[in-house]
């Protein structure tokens, strides 16, 4: 089948750098299905690349001057491509435990071609046991001399690169017949495809991704490496939404800033003019490709795209670029500076290199130091699947049984050819990272029976649309909570999507897995064994201290402020939806649960909106509605704060109060602080209660403002003694809990306005009187 630009990388089969669309990208990796080819380079000079039609691309990483003492050497490299020799990488330093195929469990086939396969694997031995990786397995016998060189070059480059925005090589090893590369498994998918399908983003959002990409190029160039294959398929998202540059099969090493390479390679639409005309290219070629990516991100279109490849190349060499009028002056300026056909005049080609690009006005608001340290949150977090999910891969491959078949050695000296190939990353021994646990979105949830993997235990809760049970995973005997939602009565898609993106937050309930059958959705969540927040007070039969209450409120505000910053409103922050994960009720184990009524900000076309997009392009009435939802979250926490401090609710006097009575008190907006208990509470606490319960949502503090309030900020210095029980009296906390629930129910069931005939409205009656009076006056005048 033919592919078109914009098709998800998953359908191409590879989200970590082996794209079946350009076989050259796969030359050190996988030559996937020929009918999946999309980007094909044209060659007329057989010295540039092999003329074999099954291997239409050649390596693009070019090293421009190897750093001194870098542990490898390149022998007899000639930049005119007239001759090539093998690369001796025997001097690469190895550290830590040596890996071999027996240490990896094969989980799925991710791709397959004439060179070998790509597997999803899990490490089953060693300190990083349990980690999931992508494993390229290459058959030595099928690798031509040029392919062997590129394979070792890719391994060589990746072994010496450690950068937050570049894919990491963890191990490289070989058997007599095969080569193995163990890489990051990136589950976030292709950045541009994901964003174009899921989220509305703006020029400010583009700055973030382009800045991270610029830092990646800066690092490569500092090592003397020209990337030469910058395109959307090679820029992927990690679990947090940061980019990772992948696929170094087309990169080239060992040229300095004044030398050039003459290879014709890459993807035509992203090629610089000097690559097409074969006059030699340097690192500046990457900056042209950066401009193409920037243009595509901002407009959704390629800057140069003809009827066919030849026409596209002609446009790149000669056509005048049409600059969209809606781009800012800074964006247009940067694009023009990157699209200089004379590479010597191109921004970044000067003596300061990438620094010239970083100093451009387009990036004026970007703090590159914080960005490099990942101290700036990405504008978009992908909805991730389980740690070993392959939902973004071609099912043609993933449905196959993973099997690493034996291979004959390439030749009698096959092992010697790849001498020094083995490698173990330093980080493998030094870092012990937790595996992120999240889940598939509902459309791709697991469809095998939930009871195949879990045993359902006792019921622990229920709601209007769902029931919650304890459950136990059969394989590990670990206990979870399973929320079962009937599809016929409630659509859980939004709830699952929100938890996929945000359950990593410390104070949001963790979502581990999702199952789906014909009648229900099964959400496997963290089991909160500490129970409800107010149950703790019920059991204590006394109030906590201000210090304890402030710690609880700080954590809740932290979670709500995060959700609001991500364009999510919970809209159901009742006391029953705030639980403790641990039995000891430590405030650090607080969890906000039940996102059934939560909402994400979406554009009219259903796509998610980043904060920048929301602020710039959303209608005022939509913003007011979003602000109202978020303000209600703060109000709900204000009710809870009042109750925890005083032992009574602000608007319900007892369990027998009617909704109308409660709503009347809420509408009055009067909060009495005359009870003796308030005499024992600090003025700062009283001030925060008033601000969170302000009847006017426009005056009410936001979650961020509440989190910055003085009372929260000085929580460690607050009194640690319980609020005096003699002032409160004997607490019936069960009645307090019921009264609090009545308050939330009253708000949720606030009666809607009863519509009556138009003629019965006061305005209609007044106008009718005016008409009757006018007619009366007219008749009187006529009779006179």
UniProtKB/Swiss-Prot annotation:
It comes from the Eukaryota. It comes from Caenorhabditis elegans. Transmembrane segments: none annotated. Serine/threonine kinase that may play a role in mediating the growth-factor and stress induced activation of transcription. Suppresses germline tumor formation by preventing the dedifferentiation of secondary spermatocytes probably downstream of mpk-1. The lineage of its organism: Eukaryota, Metazoa, Ecdysozoa, Nematoda, Chromadorea. Residues 104-363, 454-712 form the Protein kinase domain. GO terms for molecular function: ATP binding; magnesium ion binding; protein serine kinase activity; ribosomal protein S6 kinase activity. Its cofactor is Mg(2+). ATP binds at residues 110-118, 136, 460-468, 483. The active site is at 229 (proton acceptor), 572 (proton acceptor). SUPFAM superfamilies: Protein kinase-like (PK-like) (SSF56112). Its EC number is 2.7.11.1. Autophosphorylated on Ser-422, as part of the activation process. InterPro entries: AGC-kinase_C, Kinase-like_dom_sf, Pkinase_C, Prot_kinase_dom, Protein_kinase_ATP_BS, Ribosomal_S6_kinase_II, RSK_N, Ser/Thr_kinase_AS. Keywords: ATP-binding, Kinase, Nucleotide-binding, Phosphoprotein, Repeat, Serine/threonine-protein kinase, Transferase. This is Putative ribosomal protein S6 kinase alpha-1.
